[in-house]
Amino acid sequence: MEYKLLVGLEVHVQLGLKTKAFCGCKNDFGGIPNSRTCPTCLGLPGALPSINKELISSAILAGHATNSKIKNIIKFDRKHYAYPDLPKGYQISQNDAPICENGFIFIETCSGLKKINIIRIHMEEDSGKSLHLLESENRSYIDFNRSGAPLLEIVSNPDINNGEEAVAYLSALREIFRYLDLSDCNMENGSFRCDVNVNLLINENGVEYKTPISEIKNLNSFKSVKLAIDYEKSRQKEEWILHRRTFESVGKHTMGFDDKKGITVLQRSKETVADYRYIKDPDLPLIKLDDSYIESIKSNRMVELPFDTRVRLKEQYGLSDFDVVTLTADKNLVKYFEEAAIASSDPKRVANWILSEVLSVLNDREMNILDFNLPPSYISELVEFIVNDRVSGKIAKEIFLEMLERNVSSAIIINEKNLAQISDISFIESVVFEVLNENPKSIELYKKGKSHAIKFMMGQIMRKTSGRVNPVLANEILMNKLRDV
């Protein structure tokens, strides 16, 4: 039996707009429960929705970024289902006419680039949030602050074949939406949510079968996504061997994922499109978009996306794959690097310094680059001192720590403390001569082939110059003198 894992993802991105999708309530996370509501997002009789123009422009921008075909006619539908946190009894969404279709993005995998096709992107509103505070309480609470929040749902083709690819796809989408400033994509706060559809394509003696699709919900981290996919792959394989159930006979069902046990759990059979009783929303008109408007969104708001940035950074600065992946994880870090690199004769070393010393500080202090107190020019200046042998790498790290503490440039500290590296040959020769005169035993050990004697004498040279001497020059001069002894 041969089989292939098929994974499709439905990603919900909550947009960071100022107001909700169909009313004027503030669109923010948290706050006093039910403090950001109005008759419209509470579903009160007679309240009418009005379309947030920024919802449409954001969807268009997302379409451009994912190489999608963008529709000229926008239609909104009502998706009916009964749940306590859905006060109207329906969700405003898009059914048969999504704003974007037939897109794709590339992901980077261990075997190279892979194209993931996107079936559709559609606009919709979020539901409220049910809160189950205490198991002992025989009740639940509902916070409608989230009700009506603007969402985009991105539905991929089942082109993903393992958990690692799923995480790579989610990471790529998250980067795109963050680069475009459409969302903070914070999974903990629910602004980036994912449902995973998993089944197997089985080949037995040339005959293909598909197992029932499991839609796995409540995945709150990339780690959970990977674990759920890996578990479901094994579960479906075993179920096929035991029961040989196919998608045609069973269809689709909804699963939950137990993080503690690392297993999927059957919740219910999946609703069909007919179960949702979609109808066109009679309160929202059809909207026609001119081609010129669609293109204007691209020309005015599109930025260089992370995949393209990685390619450019490698070509322009000679950076490694690791360097560019780490830098582009945060577009503000890329900006910081490029502002430092433009003033440096060695951009590669600037990148190394940022990815080691600067990121270490950011991680220790749990801050991002926007909160970092040193401007990019300070980093490029310090790197130039290293490149030009004005300071050693060891001294540079000490200078960097003082720069952080005092918020001053490296030049000021070097001048104040006379830390510039000594490269004057005549001065170094005098120090070497002094060390040789003081250590005749070390000279004898060197002549007997004892390499540790050289290390000892170099240590003496560094001590006499307070670590400021150019070590390469000092070692070269020392070796020349020893050969002459």
Swiss-Prot record:
Tell me any Pfam family this protein matches: GatB_N
A single GO molecular function term of this UniProt record: ATP binding
- Asked if the keyword ATP-binding belongs to this entry, the reply reads yes
Q: Which domain of life is it from?
A: Bacteria
Q: Which PROSITE patterns match?
A: GATB (PS01234)
Its recorded reaction(s) are: L-glutamyl-tRNA(Gln) + L-glutamine + ATP + H2O = L-glutaminyl-tRNA(Gln) + L-glutamate + ADP + phosphate + H(+); L-aspartyl-tRNA(Asn) + L-glutamine + ATP + H2O = L-asparaginyl-tRNA(Asn) + L-glutamate + ADP + phosphate + 2 H(+)
Known NCBIfam families for this protein? gatB, PRK05477.1-2, PRK05477.1-4
Subunit relationships: Heterotrimer of A, B and C subunits.
What this chain does, per the entry, is described as:
Allows the formation of correctly charged Asn-tRNA(Asn) or Gln-tRNA(Gln) through the transamidation of misacylated Asp-tRNA(Asn) or Glu-tRNA(Gln) in organisms which lack either or both of asparaginyl-tRNA or glutaminyl-tRNA synthetases. The reaction takes place in the presence of glutamine and ATP through an activated phospho-Asp-tRNA(Asn) or phospho-Glu-tRNA(Gln).
Q: What is this protein called?
A: Aspartyl/glutamyl-tRNA(Asn/Gln) amidotransferase subunit B
Q: What species was this sequence derived from?
A: Borrelia turicatae (strain 91E135)
- Report the gene name: gatB
